[in-house]
């Protein structure tokens, strides 16, 4: 009877620390570091009139793609954001996705 009064997760049913060590040995995949496209091509000026290039950095919903996804460095991301905003203001790029 004393065994039936125990809680369902009693110490005898818990996994030991050795199980965690085995489970923690997952295969680690090599993630290639993203390099800034503008730094590689040595582009200093991001032109707001180059819609084809800017469109690659705008998601299908109309949002600007973040740095961690696009791989652009911080200075170029700031210039890219300014160029996309200028292109939106003169109606070269949409503010939102068309439904």
UniProtKB/Swiss-Prot annotation:
Pfam families: Ribosomal_S18 (PF01084)
Tagged with keyword Ribonucleoprotein: yes
Domain of life: Bacteria
The UniProt record lists the keyword DNA-binding: no
Signal peptide range: none
SUPFAM superfamilies attached to this UniProt entry: Ribosomal protein S18 (SSF46911)
InterPro entries the UniProt entry points to: Ribosomal_bS18, Ribosomal_bS18_sf
Gene3D superfamilies documented for this protein: Ribosomal protein S18 (4.10.640.10)
GO cellular component, one term: cytosolic small ribosomal subunit
GO biological process: translation
Annotated region described as Disordered, given as residue ranges: 1-25
Keywords: Ribonucleoprotein, Ribosomal protein, RNA-binding, rRNA-binding
Entry similarity comment: Belongs to the bacterial ribosomal protein bS18 family.
Subunit organization: Part of the 30S ribosomal subunit. Forms a tight heterodimer with protein bS6.
HAMAP family xrefs: Ribosomal_bS18
Listed name of the protein: Small ribosomal subunit protein bS18
Underlying gene: rpsR
């Amino acid at each position: 009877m004393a065994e039936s009064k125990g809680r369902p997760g009693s110490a005898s049913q818990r996994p030991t620390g050795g199980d965690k060590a085995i489970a923690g040995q997952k295969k680690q995949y090599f993630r290639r570091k993203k390099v800034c496209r503008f730094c590689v091509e040595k582009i200093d000026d991001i032109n707001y009139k180059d819609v084809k290039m800017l469109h690659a950095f705008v998601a299908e919903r109309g949002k600007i793609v973040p740095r961690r996804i696009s791989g652009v460095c911080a200075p170029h991301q700031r210039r890219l954001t300014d160029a996309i905003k200028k292109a939106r203001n003169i109606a070269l790029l949409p503010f939102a996705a068309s439904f």
